[in-house]
């Protein structure tokens, strides 16, 4: 039993550490993006701007222009059939604002100033009456409550009962 456990661990030790013999790096220098491989890089799909260092470094262009594509790292003489690939998808936020404490303080400060100016404007326009008050407002203030309404006479409760009472009516037959 002990020998089978040792044999299983030797198999795992031999199989697991076998990774890719290639070292693919995606780096950003200044404002450009580069794909670098320790053997040679091959372009399959996407953006390419230029090659450097005997096809070991590939310039993808400016990071602001969102470079993307699939790139292969070719095998060496010993491992000719082995290839390793990397997919690059760069997405830059061109319309973003960095939200730090200074920006937040500025937003809050400007918000308070705008609120105060709005309150001042409402106070100035609503607080003062322009012109003189209307004559109807003065007359109503002088009348007593019982004089506001005229009582109905002779049970004539329709609105237009007294208008044109003596006038002859035109009836067409």
UniProtKB/Swiss-Prot annotation:
Annotated GO biological process: adaptive immune response; cell surface receptor signaling pathway; positive thymic T cell selection; protein-containing complex assembly; T cell activation
Carbohydrate attachment residues: 38, 55, 74
Bilayer disposition of the protein: Single-pass type I membrane protein
Recorded superkingdom: Eukaryota
Pfam families from the UniProt entry: Ig_4 (PF16680), ITAM (PF02189)
PTM-bearing positions, type Phosphotyrosine: 149, 160
Side Extracellular, residues: 22-105
Protein name: T-cell surface glycoprotein CD3 delta chain
Native species: Mus musculus (Mouse)
Name of the gene: Cd3d
